[in-house]
Amino acid sequence: MLKLFSAFRKDKIWDFDGGIHPPEMKTQSNGTPLRQIPLAPRFVIPLKQHIGAEGELCVSVGDRVLRGQALTHGRGKMLPVHAPTSGTVIAVAPHSTAHPSALAELSVIIDADGEDRWIEREGWSDYRAHSREALIERIHQYGVAGLGGAGFPTGVKLQGGIDKITTLIINAAECEPYITADDRLMQDCAAQIVEGIRILAYILQPREVLIGIEDNKPQAISMLRAVLADAHDISLRVIPTKYPSGGAKQLTQILTGKQVPHGGRSSDIGVLMQNVGTAYAVKRAVVDGEPITERVVTLTGEAVSRPGNIWARLGTPVRHLLNNAGFCPSADQMVIMGGPLMGFTLPWLDVPVVKITNCLLAPSATEMGAPQEETSCIRCSACADACPADLLPQQLYWFSKGQQHDKATAHHIADCIECGACAWVCPSNIPLVQYFRQEKAEINAIRLEEKRAAEAKARFEARQARLEREKAARLARHKSAAVQPAAKDQDAIAAALARVKEKQAQATQPVIIQAGSLPDNSAAIAAREARKAQARAKQAGHPMADSATSGDDPRKAAVEAAVARAKARKQEQQAISEAAEPVDPRKAAVEAAIARAKARKQEQQAVSEAAEPVDPRKAAVEAAIARAKARKQEQQAVSVPVEPVDPRKAAVAAAIARVQAKKAAQQQVVNEE
């Protein structure tokens, strides 16, 4: 009974919710064998043709390359790209690529030399003699990626599935209208595909290997059955035609009955899926030693006169392929890369073929129909009925249009496979897939910005923590350095400070001498000044005598003598009071020079005044005033306390006073005569 149940379950297939049945339009291109076309004169090879980062460039402008030569290094998850033919690298520059907006990607531009020479190829015909890790590395370095449309690096995918996968599924459904690349490849290269499947099974070692193919490909089914006639390790499952049966989650559910959880992947339930084109590329990389330099591309649509499937070299401009298919463009001709439901319109035809290019559709105006105007959603729920991912497209539409990113995320917009079934059935002609693509791009941008902000915050907090640790370490060092020294060290420090202070005090202390004390050389200075005064008096005596004989008044002479005596006493008193204070030596020298200048000036004035007649009354008044001032100064001098006197200044002042006294006496003698 268990054997009957297992046999029944072995061939059982399941179904998924939703899905549509659009016109297939496959007979235009699947009736003719694969063909080669002439090489293009120039190839543009984008460095990024897969999910993930681009590889590191390893060629320069002017280098000559061979077909299959690596143009970039494949380190980590970076997948290398290879030269599609032999020629010369003429540029490494940004170029428009296969993208709805024709975004520019860094590309290697090669001028073909027409020789199409290969690198030296080394195949592993006995691949079982090599380890699984070596096979994965070879697949990765030979640039094999998912050729079903995703472009995920095959080596990375296999590395993550070792010893975790129970079911290996080969996707041969090819459910989208117009596309027949996989169909034709299975018809012409079934044996090579099966060999590639066995290489994948050797690496993953799953419990079962399933090939899922729709029933609208009878020739391909026949070829595969012929190759698998005596095989028991691979099962061929023919499934009903329904779009999108070729989706990874949908085909997994059809063949295994298991559903991939929201936000998860097929590997979460022990399933790994590869495309038939990928299996063929694995065989060529491992057994033949050929990197992926070409792939099958469907050329179809009523605007081409020779539709079919061709071997297209990667990097070939789309224009070159269409021209070889008899492209007859109309006034407003549209060219779609991919199928009519999941593909995108090319802005121009100079973009190159890449690893994920499976179809070039050039429909006529009648084939596409007149463009329909978008109207408001009527909430008919037709989109929800057609959605194969069990989503609510009408709600996602409102959330996307209203920029409600959180609600769109909560309604699992990330699970949308962008199959276009909802837009196909929408009676309001709303391009729902375009809204969903834009919303997912905005959500990804927001998450990327949040991630960058979190990383920046983490770096800032780490820096602040590091600065705090350094500050604490500095404070600890300062505290340890501030420990009090020993008692003997304190005594030595105190003695040194005392010596320094004593030296400073001696250097800044002024020389103070009490009033009345004179230096040892005061007598010599006084004698020298006296001799100088006598010499000056003799020189001035002759003119004074001459002027005196002219008839001076005796009373005027007496008054002048009294004034001179009063001034002399005043100057002596001032000299005594000033000498009692501490004096700066430089200041004393300046004051002495000023006093000498004043004395000379007074002598000159006295000589000039002596020649003029004097009023007796005026002289008497001046004499009385002089006596009064002299008495007042004597009283002030008595009241002023005696202070320390600078001996040098005192000596200078005393000498000046004596000179003036002698001068006054001489003047008096002259007047009396």
From Swiss-Prot:
User: What NCBIfam families does UniProt report for this protein, alphabetically?
Assistant: PRK05035.1, rnfC
The UniProt keyword set, sorted, is: 4Fe-4S, Cell inner membrane, Cell membrane, Electron transport, Iron, Iron-sulfur, Membrane, Metal-binding, Repeat, Translocase, Transport
Binding of [4Fe-4S] cluster 1 occurs at C377, C380, C383, C426
Role played: Part of a membrane-bound complex that couples electron transfer with translocation of ions across the membrane. Required to maintain the reduced state of SoxR.
Q: How is the cofactor bound?
A: Binds 2 [4Fe-4S] clusters per subunit.
Q: What is this protein called?
A: Ion-translocating oxidoreductase complex subunit C
Q: Which InterPro entries match?
A: 4Fe4S_Fe-S-bd, 4Fe4S_Fe_S_CS, Ion_transpt_RnfC/RsxC, Nuo51_FMN-bd, Nuo51_FMN-bd_sf, RnfC_N, Soluble_ligand-bd
Q: List the PANTHER family.
A: ION-TRANSLOCATING OXIDOREDUCTASE COMPLEX SUBUNIT C
Q: State the Gene Ontology terms under molecular function.
A: 4 iron, 4 sulfur cluster binding; electron transfer activity; metal ion binding
Give the quaternary structure. Answer: The complex is composed of six subunits: RsxA, RsxB, RsxC, RsxD, RsxE and RsxG.
User: Which family is this sequence assigned to?
Assistant: Belongs to the 4Fe4S bacterial-type ferredoxin family. RnfC subfamily.
Q: What is the lineage of its organism?
A: Bacteria, Pseudomonadati, Pseudomonadota, Gammaproteobacteria, Enterobacterales
Give the main EC class. Answer: translocase
**Which co-factors does it depend on?**
[4Fe-4S] cluster
Stretches the record annotates as Disordered = 529-554
The principal localisation class reads membrane
Stated EC number for the protein is 7.-.-.-
Tell me the membrane topology, using the record's own terms: Peripheral membrane protein
Residue positions annotated to bind [4Fe-4S] cluster 2 are: C387, C416, C419, C422
Limits of the 4Fe-4S ferredoxin-type domain: 368-397, 407-436
